Amino acid sequence: MMSPIYFAYQLLLSKRMPVMLLALLLGQYSIAQTDSVFKMTKEHGHFFCQTTLNGVNAKVMMETGVPGLMMSEAFYEAHKDSLKLDVKESDEKIRHITGFRHVKYTAQARMQIGDAIFEGPVHILQEDQAITLPLHMLHHPSDSSAIIWLDLSRLQFRVCSRDRLQNLTRKASVWSLTYTQYGMPVVTTPLSIKAAGHRIDITGQFIVDLGNASLLFLNRYDAEVDKLMSDSRVHLIDIHDNRRGKTYSQAFRVDKLTICDRTYHDDTVGVTTFKGLEGCGMLGLKFFTMPVVFDFDENKLYLCK
């Protein structure tokens, strides 16, 4: 089969293709050759991809709000010979918004995830658990860069090399990232909310949680957020976990919300009292209406136009 580069070269010689179009095609070919590409599906507000973990076929959920790669004990036991994890028994509990997860084994691992490299902690849980993949622990195979290009509208993310960053982030706004004690990315930003005649304004730290299907969760465990919520007197409704028969959070409707200089209208904001959650809340998937680039090496978040 004729290679794309040779085919484009022949077209240029025959003067059948404008130079700019040729450059575009070669650029797209270069991207395909250098990026580790993951195609996603959307299910119940979350994003999944079909990939491999050390050669084992697996359906994984995209995340940034977890402290490592997480999988069920059943999946691990079925594939442990291929996964090749050096596990240690654990009695750790991981706090989740709907309750605790019980950790059976832990490991520190470097694994092949599709064409990319995962490096970080692995938690093997007793409960039935979707495999959750923390994007901030993925690295490009050629230079180990932790750069993620994400476009939810195209159902795709890419693990990119360092030399791709400048082209990916032209005209993007830039936000600095810090990290929680568990390594989850955090952005510091002003937040302004208008809801039913009330107004909430705060500048604070928000965990970037790609496992959170909402636009935003506010954390009333933070004293400043709690005071603002009490003073604003917005009407809160309970959100139930039907499987456990418990109320795990609340929510309220907003007329207008601005965060990271991006504005959203007529949406819902969740409210939780999540003991131990750092910062003012969690920024979720519905925020990402634009392509974004995470540079986890240089601690930058780029919001593309």
Regions picked out by a protein language model, each given a short descriptive name:
Residues 33-305:
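Pepsin/retropepsin-fold aspartyl endopeptidases
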